[in-house]
Amino acid sequence: MAIYLDFENHIKEIQNEIELALIRGDEDAKEILEKRLDKEVKSIYSNLTDFQKLQLARHPDRPYAMDYIDLILKDKYEVFGDRHYNDDKAIVCFIGKIDNVPVVVIGEEKGRGTKNKLLRNFGMPNPCGYRKALKMAKFAEKFNLPILMLVDTAGAYPGIGAEERGQSEAIAKNLQEFASLKVPTISVIIGEGGSGGALAIAVADKLAMMEYSIFSVISPEGCAAILWDDPSKTEVAIKAMKITPRDLKEAGLIDDIILEPSKGAHRDKFSAANTIKEYFLDALRTIQQDPHFLENRYQKLMSLGSFVESMN
C-alpha cells in the first residue's frame, strides 16, 4: 500500500476516487480524475517547502540503492568484505554492466522491513563498509572500470565499536584515495546525504543530487538541538543550512541536479532509475572525452570552500 505524506492528502483522495472509478468501470470519470490528479500533483510539487523536500528524501517508499541496482545493472555480481574485519551490509558493492558498459557500483543501502533494516544497520555504515568501498574502487582502478556511487545515509554509524575500529580514519582515507582514482567516478545522492557518512563515497568527477534529496553536515533536527536546544526549530535549521539541490548547486558544491518523475521517485522508481542510468552514461562520456579529467577533479576539489578576503 502506498504511503502518503501529510501534504499529499489531496493526491491520496483523488487516487482513491480513481480506483473506485476503475471498480465501477467508469472510464469517463477516470479520465476526468486523472487530469485533476495531474493538476494537483503539479500544484503541490511546484510549491514544496524545504521541510517537505526533506520529508520526500526520507520517504519510506523512496527507491534505495538496491532498487536502482536491480533496475539498471545487468550481469551483476556482488562483492563482499573489506579484507580486514567484516562485511558491512550497509554498503553494497557490485560489478556489472549498464547498457553494456562494464562498471563498478557502490551504494549505501538502508533496507526495507524491520529484519532487513537491522541487517543493513539502517544504512549507517561501519568502518569496514567504507573499507569495502575503497577495496572496490581500487579494483575498478586496476581494471580501468568507471565507478557509480549511490549515496543514501543519515550518517556514518556513531557506535563505540565503529569508533574503536577507526571510523574517522576510514572516511578520511576514502576522501584521500577517491580524489586520486585514475578512472571516471560519478556519485549520485539519491535520498539522504548525511555528513561524513555520505562524503566517503561522494568524492567524484561528477556529483549529482536527485531533485528531492538532501546533502548536509548534520541532520536539521541535530542542528536545531545544538544551536537552539529546540527541536521545533527544525524548519529554521533547514533554511539556514541550505541542504537542497538548488542551494548546493548555486553554491557550487554539486555539479548537477537530476529531475525526478512528476510525483517523485517514490511513485515511479522505473522512470527514476532510467534517469539515473542516462545521467551516468552522459556524464561518463563527458569525462572520458576529457584528457585532463584527473586535473579537473583535483582543481574542483581544491576550490571547495575557497574565498577571497579583501582589506578595506
Swiss-Prot record:
UniProt EC number: 2.1.3.15
Pathway given in the UniProt record: Lipid metabolism; malonyl-CoA biosynthesis; malonyl-CoA from acetyl-CoA: step 1/1
UniProt key word ATP-binding: yes
Keywords for this protein: ATP-binding, Cytoplasm, Fatty acid biosynthesis, Fatty acid metabolism, Lipid biosynthesis, Lipid metabolism, Nucleotide-binding, Transferase
Domain CoA carboxyltransferase C-terminal: 36-286
Family annotation (SUPFAM superfamilies): ClpP/crotonase (SSF52096)
This protein's GO CC annotations: acetyl-CoA carboxylase complex
A Gene Ontology biological process term: fatty acid biosynthetic process
Record-linked Pfam families: ACCA (PF03255)
Keyword Nucleotide-binding: yes
Compartments where located: Cytoplasm
Domain of life per record: Bacteria
GO molecular function, one term: carboxyl- or carbamoyltransferase activity
Enzymatic reactions: N(6)-carboxybiotinyl-L-lysyl-[protein] + acetyl-CoA = N(6)-biotinyl-L-lysyl-[protein] + malonyl-CoA
Assembly notes: Acetyl-CoA carboxylase is a heterohexamer composed of biotin carboxyl carrier protein (AccB), biotin carboxylase (AccC) and two subunits each of ACCase subunit alpha (AccA) and ACCase subunit beta (AccD).
NCBIfam families: accA, AccA_sub, PRK05724.1
Role noted for this protein: Component of the acetyl coenzyme A carboxylase (ACC) complex. First, biotin carboxylase catalyzes the carboxylation of biotin on its carrier protein (BCCP) and then the CO(2) group is transferred by the carboxyltransferase to acetyl-CoA to form malonyl-CoA.
Stated family: Belongs to the AccA family.
Protein name: Acetyl-coenzyme A carboxylase carboxyl transferase subunit alpha
Species whose genome carries this gene: Helicobacter pylori (strain HPAG1)
